[in-house]
Amino acid sequence: MKKILIVEGNLREENQSFTDGGIKTHTESLKDSINYFTKDLEIDVVNPSSDSNVSDVVKNLNKYDGMIWGGSSLNIYNDTPEIRRQLDFMRECQNNIKNILAICWGMQVAVTVAGGEVKRCERGAHRGIAHDIEINEEGLKHNIYKNKNKIFNTPAFNFDEVVTLPANSILLASNSINKVMGVSFKAGVSNIWGIQYHPEISYEKMISLIHFRTERLLNNKAFK
């Protein structure tokens, strides 16, 4: 049975607020999505910002066939201890795990560790849905977009974007908000597929997230 590691990007306090609000955490959504396709996987979960056993997990990273790193409300350019722990953990993962799917925040962490850069979005933000993502010619040849419509919409929630890709990256998809909506690159021993959207989150959950974050969004002038 193949072994998969899911990395939770949100802080424990944020996840508790999700639970208190009746909303599934990103890890729970990822598990639901995986279970929809197969239950024939052994799945472990780690939160590098909050868990006390991260060093033990690092020692055994090479036992995993793949890793999925999910979303977060954090901003990579804020130099906090929690973010530094995530960057350190991603660095270990890139040295030990061959296949990584990096979703939204996960992509931003993977890109940063591999030498790229993330900044605040300059052309707006995705607040629930990313419209008109277009797969380019390289993307149409990539397995992540096999049988995918060339132009599609999908759940997304991000205010930051990748502005500089790691060396030897292949841009796969873009839209009018973010040039980097899909990317493939290698770092360490890892083949990394990165996406700036959330295929694991239902539209229903995204609506709940918007209601849940209404005050925060308004205070941050997210709809200005």
Label every model-predicted segment:
Residues V58-L61, V109-T112, V163-P166, S184-F185:
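Short loop/helix-cap segments at secondary-structure boundaries that form the rim of catalytic
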Residues M1-D88, E92-N96, F223-K224:
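N-terminal beta1-alpha1 cap of cysteine-dependent amidohydrolase-like domains
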Residues S72-G139:
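Cysteine-nucleophile active-site neighborhood
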Residues S50-S55, H126-G128, L140, K179-M181:
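A short acidic, often aromatic-flanked loop/helix-cap motif at beta-alpha or helix-coil junctions
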Residues I43-P48, Y77-T80, A130-E134, N149-I151, ...:
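Short, flexible loop segments at the rims of nucleotide/cofactor-binding pockets, characterized by
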Residues K2-T19, K24-Y36, F89, I135-K224:
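Amide-donor transfer/coupling interface in amidating biosynthetic enzymes
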Residues V46-S49, C121, F157, S174:
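Conserved beta-strand termini and adjacent loop/short-helix elements that scaffold enzyme active sites
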